Regions:
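Soluble or luminal CAZymes and related metallo-dependent hydrolases
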Residues: 11, 48, 96, 170, ...
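General small-molecule cofactor/ligand-binding pocket signal
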Residues: 97, 164-166, 246
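Non-catalytic C-terminal accessory region of glycerolipid acyltransferases
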Residues: 2, 109-110, 133, 160-161, ...
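A conditional alpha-helix N-cap/helix-loop micro-motif detector
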Residues: 96-97, 121, 147, 168-171, ...
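Catalytic core of membrane glycerolipid acyltransferases/transacylases, capturing the structured
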Residues: 63-66, 70-74, 112-170, 195-200
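Active-site metal-coordination segments of metallo-dependent hydrolases
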Residues: 48-51, 147-148, 210-214
Length: 299
């Protein structure tokens, strides 16, 4: 899988964070929407425009003009949540609404560790890492090749919430750290909608067509019959995000293959529910329903 990092170099990221300490982020929103996004969509260098348009046209079922308009909105919202992430690094805070967090608190007081599956809808990083229940150490699986400034910002935020980063490595050594965390009855958070490292997938019905979800997260969960929560964070309005926490049940007495398929199906159903409710915040800019070897165009 091709791995891409957040747009811009370290100097640009540093200046943006410094600017956001003093400038209302709405000015940067408008500049990005009007000056940057139209150029990016016109050039379409990473094919994100094409993939987004087909998503709205074929999977959501919109007309041609409506699909084109929502492709623009989708890219503007993506830029907005990226800016919000840098605003968070600059020390700004957002109002967080929560739904279903009682499931998280319940699992926090059980002996075993558990998994939290995120996805590329909304912006998990703005609020999801604030869900750190007492009594258990929290480990977040992150892409290890990100720009230094992004990793520094993450580390600062994570240290405030007692979170340990597990960077994804080409040599797959992160799997040992995941295993160690779960053996120690800790929490591990990871995205479950994008293939990273291994090419093994589970074909699952998603938005009316078979999609290939990575088998890794579901294999980790079912190996120990762990409890799993789907956690997604959606941008509701300016300065406000909403956290959705949903338990993903599966038959722990079934065969390993059946357990993985059941868990992938439950995850896909919850993801589809949110995607249909907030289609403009779907940020998997590649053909999610193509051959399993298709490569994402941006992270």
């Amino acid at each position: 899988m091709k791995k891409n990092t957040t747009f811009g170099n370290a100097w640009m990221h540093r200046q943006l964070i410094n600017m956001l300490r003093f400038v209302d982020e709405r000015f940067i929103y408008v500049f990005t929407w009007t000056m940057i996004m139209p150029v990016c969509l016109l050039l379409n260098t990473n094919h994100s425009r094409s993939h987004a348009y087909r998503f709205f046209r074929n999977r959501i079922g919109l007309g041609r003009w409506s699909s084109a308009w929502h492709t623009y909105l989708n890219h503007c919202l993506f830029a907005t949540v990226v800016i919000d992430r840098f605003a968070m690094f600059a020390g700004k805070r957002f109002d967080i609404e929560q739904e279903g967090t009682e499931y998280l608190r319940e699992l926090a007081f059980q002996d075993d560790g558990f998994l939290m599956f995120s996805s590329h809808i909304g912006c998990y990083e703005v609020a999801g890492y604030s869900l750190t229940p007492p009594g258990k150490r929290y480990n977040a699986l992150v892409y290890g090749g990100e720009k230094d400034r992004i990793m520094e910002g993450r580390q600062k935020q994570f240290s405030e919430h007692n979170i340990t980063m597990i960077p994804i490595k080409e040599d797959m050594s992160h799997l040992f750290k995941i295993n160690e965390a779960l053996v120690n009855h800790e929490i591990v958070s990871m995205p479950a909608d994008r293939v990273m490292g291994s090419s093994k997938t589970i074909p699952t019905e998603f938005l009316g067509k078979t999609a290939h979800f990575p088998s890794g997260p579901f294999a980790v969960a079912t190996m120990r019959n762990l409890e799993v929560l789907a956690i997604n964070v959606i941008r509701i309005s300016r300065k406000k995000y909403k956290i959705f926490v949903v338990p993903l049940a599966y038959d722990k007495q079934a065969s390993r293959k059946q357990k993985m398929e059941q868990l992938a199906k439950k995850y896909a159903e919850e993801l589809e529910r949110l995607v249909r409710q907030y289609p403009d915040q779907w940020y998997n800019f590649y053909d999610f329903w193509a051959d399993k070897n298709a490569e994402p165009s941006i992270a």
